[in-house]
């Protein structure tokens, strides 16, 4: 989130953060949001550990709509979102994933890239669909996989690119430059 806030504050991204929600009660993102004067709230997702559904999904949609949100950015939100949220914000839910999708969806993708002997890894910003990390791709940034990389060193390099990729994708979206054709997102 910090890279998005920074891009807005520098005038590099014409957007407004209307609400920050976190599914972890003491998540650092809530404190970070408050330091920037952004409305922030914890969203109780119990009893589900990996999904956003039921009353929590209803509450999430209610809060986002009440705040006037038209786009939902999933940054560090490690839950599977369901069709109800996607229908409330059609093709306006974006996620960032630390892999060059469609390779290595799900968790620990940088470790998977090392295990498979990949020569490049990276990050993908994509629209969220009903699958897991399977929506149309907006932006990708690649990093080399070095011979002496560990999961930690590779992940750190990927995170640098994450901080560039999300603001870039949001700039395209805010400027109306994204056109979805099937699985392809054209930027024009």
Regions found by a protein language model. Give the residues of each.
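One-carbon transfer enzymes
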Residues: 1-188
